[in-house]
Regions:
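Bacterial Sec-exported substrate-binding components of ABC uptake systems
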Residues: 2, 6, 11-92, 201-234, ...
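Short helix-initiation/N-cap motifs at beta->coil->alpha
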Residues: 58, 68-70, 127-143, 182, ...
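Short helices/loops that flank or line small-molecule/ion binding pockets
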Residues: 77, 140-151, 171, 273-283
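A short, structured surface patch at a secondary-structure boundary
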Residues: 81-149, 153-159, 260-263
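Short, structured coil segments at secondary-structure junctions
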Residues: 98, 171-172, 258, 312-313
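Extracytoplasmic ligand-binding site segments that recognize negatively charged/polar headgroups
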Residues: 110-115, 161-165, 177-193, 228-253
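Structured C-terminal subdomain patch of bacterial secreted/periplasmic proteins
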Residues: 185-199, 205-209, 219, 288-346
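Alpha-helical, coiled-coil/dimerization segments enriched in small aliphatic residues
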Residues: 243-271
Length: 346
């Protein structure tokens, strides 16, 4: 299995919303613009190196585990009540058969759509999520919402600020395990961590075997067909151009894993906006546009010079659920990657 040509170093967008950019905290991790409809990672952390021995062998009671940010967290073993504050975490939690443990999930403020701004309609239905489970994570974090859910453990990504994490742990006394993979292999690591927390290592190993097999299949496909068609992958558009993924993002890494080359893959801006003239000059063989949350082909057709892009003219514009491009979770590998392999290497 080959490593992706670009190992993501910046967190993929993590929170779907259409909010003014003035609310966003770290500009390098957001889509710069007045308002966009994608997921956004709000916060970055200086991850401390784990010191000494942290991880213990759990069997009951509390145990220590090192999370993705290098934090040594003392967590309850197999907690019955868990708050999951990220769609990318809810995905493996569900796949591992842990839905019954989930008592709360992340939501945006009611005025901006609540649950439906963080989760797609398919996710809400599949995972049986309800508005009553909402913990508001934006534009401000509601400690009260979380307290009312009475979880024993919080699993969160970097849509949660360090201040909020500190408040959860010090004010409420609830441990927080941060799951924010930095690479594709980190997705498998998080599956293993979740398996350890809930005492279901066998199920985690089985899921990781599926993920490994899919990555191996992608590697074999690239060997059998070494062509690397150029691609514009976009998740939103406005009058100025097409929002896309630069270097160090999961969106770019997924394109590379599928045996193609993003026309913006070397851009130092993780989430640049490409003007129409740049897209036309690059002449990508394919266009992959993110769908869901109100985005569809008709929406992108309103973009500058959309109908003049040769890939669009030749019928090589393909819609793909935005979750597959932005959420670092098993579904990105199990569903998104095979779809792209079929598109680029039929």
């Amino acid at each position: 299995m080959n490593s992706p040509a670009v190992a993501p170093t910046a967190a993929p967008p993590q929170h779907r919303t259409r909010v003014p950019v003035s609310w966003l905290v770290v500009i390098v991790l957001v889509v710069a613009g007045s308002a966009v409809g994608v997921t956004v990672a709000y916060y970055t952390y200086n991850s401390p190196a784990a010191s000494g021995t942290c991880t213990s062998n759990p069997s009951s009671g509390n145990f220590s585990i090192t999370d993705d940010l290098g934090r040594c967290v003392t967590a309850p073993y197999n907690p019955a009540r868990v708050a999951v504050l990220s769609p990318s975490i809810m995905d493996p939690v569900y796949r591992l058969g842990l839905r019954s443990h989930v008592v709360a999930v992340d939501c945006y403020a009611d005025a901006f759509g609540g649950l439906t701004e963080d989760y797609s309609s398919d996710q809400i239905q599949l995972w049986n999520l309800t508005q009553s489970m909402c913990v508001q994570v934006g534009p401000t974090f509601s400690l009260e919402d979380l307290a009312n859910a009475t979880p024993q453990l919080v699993l969160a990504s970097t849509i949660i600020s360090l201040t909020a994490v500190d408040d959860i742990e010090t004010t409420l006394g609830i441990p927080v395990v941060m799951l924010q993979p930095a690479t594709v292999s980190g997705i498998l690591t998080d599956v293993t961590l979740i398996g350890e927390i809930f005492g279901i290592s066998s199920a985690a190993s089985a899921l990781n075997a599926q993920l490994t097999a899919e990555l191996a299949n992608a590697s074999a496909t690239r060997v059998n067909d070494p062509t690397t068609p150029s691609v514009l992958v976009t998740y939103d558009v406005d009058s100025n151009g097409y929002w896309t993924f630069g270097a160090g993002t999961f969106g770019t890494s997924l394109i590379n894993l599928s045996g193609a080359a993003s026309i913006s893959g070397s851009d130092s801006n993780p989430y640049p906006e490409l003007p129409a003239e740049t897209v036309l000059a690059a002449n990508p063989a394919f266009v992959v546009y993110g769908t869901g949350f109100g985005l569809n082909e008709s929406y992108y057709a309103g973009g500058p010079d959309w109908s003049s892009i040769p890939a669009v003219e030749s019928g090589h514009a393909v819609g793909l659920d935005s979750n597959y491009l932005t959420e670092p979770d098993p579904t990105m590998i199990l569903v998104g990657l095979p779809v792209l392999l079929t598109v680029f290497h039929p």
